[in-house]
From Swiss-Prot:
The keyword Ligase applies. This is ATP-dependent dethiobiotin synthetase BioD. The active site is at 35. InterPro entries: DTB_synth_BioD (IPR004472), P-loop_NTPase (IPR027417). Substrate binds at residue 39. One of its GO terms (molecular function) is magnesium ion binding. One of its GO terms (biological process) is biotin biosynthetic process. Keywords: ATP-binding, Biotin biosynthesis, Cytoplasm, Ligase, Magnesium, Metal-binding, Nucleotide-binding. Belongs to the dethiobiotin synthetase family. It comes from Leptospira interrogans serogroup Icterohaemorrhagiae serovar Lai (strain 56601). The keyword ATP-binding applies. Its cofactor is Mg(2+). PANTHER family: ATP-DEPENDENT DETHIOBIOTIN SYNTHETASE BIOD 2, DETHIOBIOTIN SYNTHETASE. It comes from the Bacteria.
Length: 221
């Protein structure tokens, strides 16, 4: 089945998390990667292919590619167009039973046009969601707000995956978020810095450490 990878905000690590999934299970489970809406350059697809070493056949083309790196609703307006969220919802619904990792653009409440938020499209498409959350100061508020928005729309939230550079608040942040929300943690992955990770490091060090208890795999199969 398809799974939507959403985040509490921009740059929380959705592409890195998607790369971990595809790098570990792409070939064995026959997974594909799909980012329906891309703003700015095509760096997310390129990053995933660079890190995982997967052929471009594993990476589907964006449904919308917008030049300006901004919120999708605004980026599309600058190009004199509008994202057709009805069409996008129907397309996502049609692929919901396929083995596709679908990455969202920005946070969950990002508008795709002046009438529709990302979460509404996920709800209409009836696709389950994994929430990628940060681990540092501020994570509690961001994550609990995102979870509340998800639950208010009766979206199937499979769990939270924590990703980031740890600090003194990290351990308690994870505990507090799971206790207050009642949503399970699917795991965590800690980085040493924001520096660019080489494909060798990713494949030799990151992938072997990922999903040791197969919580993510069990969702995908």
């Amino acid at each position: 089945m398809a799974v939507f990878i959403g985040g509490t905000g921009t740059d929380v690590g959705k592409t890195f998390f998607s790369s971990l999934i595809l790098g570990k299970y792409g070939e064995s489970l026959g997974l594909k990667y799909f980012k329906p809406v891309q703003t700015g350059d095509d760096s997310d697809r390129i990053t995933l292919m660079r890190l995982t070493g997967l052929h471009e056949s594993y990476v589907l083309k964006n449904y919308y590619s917008l030049a300006f790196a901004g919120s999708p609703h605004y980026s599309s307006e600058l190009e004199g167009t509008e994202i057709d969220t009805d069409e996008l919802s129907r397309h996502l619904y049609s692929i919901r039973d396929e083995k596709i990792i679908i990455e969202g653009a920005g946070g969950l409440l990002v508008p795709l046009n002046r009438r529709m938020l990302t979460l509404e499209v996920i709800r209409q498409a009836e696709i389950p969601l994994i929430l990628v959350a940060p681990t540092s100061l501020g994570a509690i508020n961001q994550t609990l707000l995102s979870i509340e928005a998800i639950q208010n729309r009766n979206i199937d939230l499979k769990g939270i995956y924590f990703l980031g550079i740890p600090d003194k608040t990290t351990e308690d942040n994870i505990r507090t978020i799971t206790e207050w929300s009642g949503v399970i943690s699917l795991g965590s992955f800690f980085l040493n810095s924001n520096e660019r990770i080489s494909c060798e490091c990713f494949q030799e060090e990151c992938i072997p450490k990922f999903d040791l208890d197969e919580s993510i795999k069990n969702i995908l199969v």
